[in-house]
């Protein structure tokens, strides 16, 4: 609004909505990230990295729980990225179990929601149920972000359910000794797994935990919404 009141040639004014305002907006957000938000985020990221490094792989049960919770908490955000970076660092040392757990913990959220929709569709709106194909594709391709809309619509119930499922999935992955010598790819890199059956077992167990919690915690949506096509 302020920019529209500033005198400027008509040739420039026509660029306001398509170029000038977006450019100024991106610049402002960049400055805020660097000089205001960036410091605290970096501090939290470093603290999380130090915590994972201190755990190492000596206590696999605790590592699986923490790693799974971090992967599912923000699904692509800082916590997720720290856990992924830790898995990449472990790969560099020849430890592929951490990446195996990372795969499982990343796949569990969309797969768990998909199972919950199949089991109890009355807990979900018609638009959410229509996301089933995308959730299954996200699970197959290790794209956790497909679960974000569900977490955003009901974070108090959905996020803890996703975290619990991923924590269980990661822990089962460590217990089975799953290793994956690939940085990403989901089911499409099954050839890089020491045992694809272990991968499926861990992912399904974690997803069932997520689905069960969602079915228990979420309330039924209005009947007319369930019946709507």
Task: Kindly give the residue locations of the regions a language model identified.
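Pore-lining transmembrane helices
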Residues: 1-227
């Amino acid at each position: 609004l302020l920019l529209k009141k500033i005198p400027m040639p008509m040739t420039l004014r026509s660029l306001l909505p398509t170029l000038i305002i977006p450019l100024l907006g991106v610049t402002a957000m960049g400055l805020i990230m660097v000089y205001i938000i960036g410091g605290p985020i970096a501090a939290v990221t470093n603290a999380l990295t130090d915590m994972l490094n201190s755990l190492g792989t000596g206590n696999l049960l605790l590592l699986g729980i923490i790693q799974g919770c971090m992967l599912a908490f923000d699904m692509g955000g800082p916590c997720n990225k720290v856990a992924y970076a830790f898995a990449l660092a472990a790969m560099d040392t020849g430890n592929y179990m951490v990446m195996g757990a990372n795969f499982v913990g990343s796949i569990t959220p969309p797969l768990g929601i998909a199972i919950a929709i199949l089991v109890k569709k009355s807990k979900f709106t018609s638009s959410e149920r229509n996301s089933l194909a995308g959730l299954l594709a996200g699970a197959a391709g290790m794209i956790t972000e497909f679960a974000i809309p569900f977490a955003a619509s009901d974070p108090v119930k959905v996020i803890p359910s996703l975290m619990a499922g991923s924590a269980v999935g990661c822990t089962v992955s460590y217990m089975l000794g799953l290793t994956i010598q690939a940085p990403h790819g989901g089911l499409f890199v099954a050839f890089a797994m020491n045992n694809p059956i272990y991968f499926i077992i861990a992912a399904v167990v974690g997803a069932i935990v997520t689905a069960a919690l969602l079915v228990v915690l979420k309330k039924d949506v209005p009947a007319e919404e369930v019946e709507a096509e």
